[in-house]
């Protein structure tokens, strides 16, 4: 399976691989766990993850999700966190122009102008940072089949 990024240029696409709406309320194996407030059915993925920063989608490691992918070129980053505060890219403040202002031509997706008929204004942009995160973990025995 090859990941496609051209959805970035289609104004009718507003989500890709998004889970359907669901409750994020905590749940417990039994009433006693609920009283203690510590669920045996929760496994935190917070911590250090493998991370690869790419300045645009064309440079991203497209197959990094595969089990046999070599992550030797990946760094480590703390999750949750912000890539900018971890030293990747530039911090974006609200009182400052966006980094692509004056660098890349950006019109709303799907609205090419007479001067610029490119269909890949976002997916083919020179500057459109992408972060690829990866973490391998073993599912605890008590969570299997749940």
Regions found by a protein language model. Name each.
Residues 1-145:
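Extended carbohydrate-recognition surfaces in non-catalytic/accessory domains of CAZymes
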């Amino acid at each position: 399976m090859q990941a496609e990024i051209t959805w970035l240029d289609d104004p009718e696409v507003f989500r890709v691989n998004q889970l359907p709406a669901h409750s994020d309320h905590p749940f417990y194996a039994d009433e006693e766990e609920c009283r203690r407030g510590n669920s045996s059915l929760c496994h935190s993925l917070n911590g250090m993850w493998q991370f690869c920063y790419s300045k645009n989608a064309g440079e991203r490691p497209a197959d990094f999700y595969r089990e046999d992918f070599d992550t030797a070129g990946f760094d480590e980053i703390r999750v949750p966190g912000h890539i900018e505060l971890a030293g990747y890219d530039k911090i974006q403040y609200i009182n400052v122009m966006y980094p692509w202002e004056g660098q890349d031509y950006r019109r709303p997706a799907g609205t090419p102008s007479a001067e610029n008929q490119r269909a890949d204004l976002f997916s083919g942009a020179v500057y459109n940072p992408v972060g690829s995160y990866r973490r391998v973990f073993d599912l605890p025995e008590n969570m299997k089949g749940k």
